[in-house]
């Protein structure tokens, strides 16, 4: 349950007289219950009044679609790959702590970042997919259970499986935390390889699903340099 208020897309309180009421049944029919749940958890802190964004909700649908298509990249390897070991353990820690603190928006953002890393690598092990699905299950129970069963990731349902644990030593990697600021406000933080330069960092941030959802419908403008 949200403690804050979901406003209409125009930023005003929803009411029939204003014509800005969002019917959840219509949203579920369009993008499904899982995407609806994920967006409600991702759209912002639970104690804040936040305007509804149809584009943002569709962005969460696209995120879950990418999770579904990870099955096309699945290998037979049961363990974590060396390339993603640090990221997976870091994501487990981040999501676990954020769930405990009810910071669901940043937990979802962390999982979106992990999915981006998996696609950048081009493959996902069974161990990596298993960890991701366990983390995502509280937010998207239907699609995660479906993938879990299709890929036979365990002999029991996902909701009865043990929550993943993380290893602090495995998280040691040369990364830098950067703050993503939109319209003058810090919206989220991302871990970026320390070796990245300015252009690589910008590309990494703009290709992140969480950032895409936050800037959906926004016009990005870079002011020209002043003339000498």
Predicted regions and their residues:
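Catalytic phosphate-handling regions of large nucleic-acid enzymes and associated NTPases
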Residues: 6-7
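Extended active-site and interfacial segments that coordinate phosphate-rich ligands
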Residues: 21-25, 30, 205-207
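Generic structural signal for well-ordered beta-strand positions
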Residues: 14-15, 187
């Amino acid at each position: 349950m949200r403690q804050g208020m979901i406003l209409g897309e125009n930023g005003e309180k929803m009411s029939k007289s204003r014509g800005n009421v969002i019917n959840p049944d219509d949203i579920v029919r369009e993008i499904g219950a899982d995407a609806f749940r994920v967006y409600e958890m991702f759209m912002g802190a639970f104690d804040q009044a936040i305007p509804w964004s149809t584009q943002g909700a569709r962005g969460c649908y696209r995120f879950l679609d990418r999770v579904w298509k990870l099955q096309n990249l699945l290998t037979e390897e049961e363990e974590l790959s060396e390339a993603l070991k640090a990221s997976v353990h870091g994501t487990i820690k981040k999501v676990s702590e954020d769930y405990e603190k009810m910071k669901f928006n940043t937990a979802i953002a962390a999982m979106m970042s992990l999915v981006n890393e998996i696609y950048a690598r081009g493959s996902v092990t069974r161990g990596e997919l298993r960890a991701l699905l366990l983390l995502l299950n509280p937010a998207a129970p239907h699609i995660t259970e479906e993938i879990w069963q299709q890929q036979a990731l365990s002999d029991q349902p996902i909701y009865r499986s043990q929550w993943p644990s993380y290893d602090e030593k495995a998280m040691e990697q040369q990364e830098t935390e950067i703050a993503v600021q939109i319209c003058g406000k810090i919206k989220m933080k991302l871990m970026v390889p320390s070796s990245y330069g300015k252009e690589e960092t910008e590309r990494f941030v703009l290709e992140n699903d969480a950032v895409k959802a936050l800037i959906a419908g926004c016009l990005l403008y870079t002011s020209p340099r002043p003339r000498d």
